[in-house]
């Protein structure tokens, strides 16, 4: 159905399927429903399961507030890198070039930057220059501008604090600026779709796809196997999900089979 379009997975590069784990002080936050896990809260054990199931990459989002939790996260990354050999992206609380350096040295392949870059966009250029664009991901938490707020050109704005706080910055323009500053990838999370399980925000994906040439990861809204191919058709190079995988509502294999059935290349 989609194979005749100029798509990321139409005979070209394989579309990546990426589970995301929220980690707080070294523990997986959102409940996980795997059978036969010794410790469902251990991100390293979960990472190994997803690796075995055919995940193309993994994303860890560190939701810890404390500095002690940051040290714990580095240890989690180290342990994961010893056991899992697919690319690992780590985000959450990354504020400085030194933070990126620590995570990469611990074994992360890519580091996602969010709030700190909003305050200081040149940080992205510094990070890309020092570590290479391929290591730096701009994470954009986008939502429709609420009624009563100042409009943005695209109709979407960048948010912080888990989508609760608007910035007034145009989300599509911000993604484009990040690409111009040297990031290698955009992790595009729709705060409108997040948690709804009603499907990815296709209009947002199309808008960002038209504005950037770097890969775009679609995040937020996955709820059924049918939701993934339309995200690729809208321009996603990779699809990311959390709870549908953790609660065994869908497997990596089912998502890849659904993509392949639409003529989309998967690994």
Curated annotation (Swiss-Prot):
Q: What GO molecular functions are on record for this protein?
A: imidazoleglycerol-phosphate synthase activity; lyase activity
User: Is the keyword Iron-sulfur assigned to this protein?
Assistant: no
Compartments (UniProt record): Cytoplasm
What is the protein's major site of localization? cytoplasm
Entry keywords, A to Z: Amino-acid biosynthesis, Cytoplasm, Histidine biosynthesis, Lyase
Q: Which SUPFAM superfamilies match?
A: Ribulose-phoshate binding barrel
Q: Which reaction does it catalyse?
A: 5-[(5-phospho-1-deoxy-D-ribulos-1-ylimino)methylamino]-1-(5-phospho-beta-D-ribosyl)imidazole-4-carboxamide + L-glutamine = D-erythro-1-(imidazol-4-yl)glycerol 3-phosphate + 5-amino-1-(5-phospho-beta-D-ribosyl)imidazole-4-carboxamide + L-glutamate + H(+)
Active site location = 22, 141
Among Gene3D superfamilies, the record links this protein to: Aldolase class I (3.20.20.70)
Similarity comment text for this entry: Belongs to the HisA/HisF family.
Family matches, as NCBIfam families: hisF (TIGR00735)
Could you identify this protein by its name?
Answer: Imidazole glycerol phosphate synthase subunit HisF
């Amino acid at each position: 159905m989609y194979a005749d379009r100029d798509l990321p997975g139409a005979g070209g590069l394989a579309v990546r399927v990426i589970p995301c784990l929220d980690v707080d002080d070294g523990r997986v936050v959102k409940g996980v429903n795997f059978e036969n896990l010794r410790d469902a809260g251990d991100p390293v054990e979960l990472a190994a399961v997803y690796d075995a199931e055919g995940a193309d990459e993994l994303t860890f989002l560190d939701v810890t507030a404390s500095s002690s939790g940051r040290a714990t996260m580095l240890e989690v990354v180290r342990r994961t890198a010893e056991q899992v050999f697919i690319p690992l992206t780590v985000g959450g609380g990354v504020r400085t070039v030194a933070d990126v350096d620590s995570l990469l040295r611990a074994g992360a392949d890519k580091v996602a930057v969010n709030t700190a870059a909003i305050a200081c966009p040149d940080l992205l250029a510094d990070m890309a220059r020092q570590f290479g664009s391929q290591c730096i991901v701009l994470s954009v938490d986008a939502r429709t501008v609420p009624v009563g707020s100042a409009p943005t050109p695209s109709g979407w704005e960048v948010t912080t604090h888990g989508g609760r706080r608007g910035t007034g910055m145009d989300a599509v323009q911000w993604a484009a600026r990040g690409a111009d500053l040297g990031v290698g990838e955009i992790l595009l999370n729709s705060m409108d779709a997040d948690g709804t399980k009603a499907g990815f925000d296709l209009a947002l994906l199309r808008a960002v796809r038209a504005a950037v040439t770097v890969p775009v990861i679609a995040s937020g809204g996955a709820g059924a196997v049918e939701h993934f191919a339309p995200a690729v058709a809208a321009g996603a190079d990779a699809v990311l999900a959390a709870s549908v995988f953790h609660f065994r509502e869908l497997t990596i294999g089912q998502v890849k089979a659904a993509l392949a059935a639409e003529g989309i290349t998967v690994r």
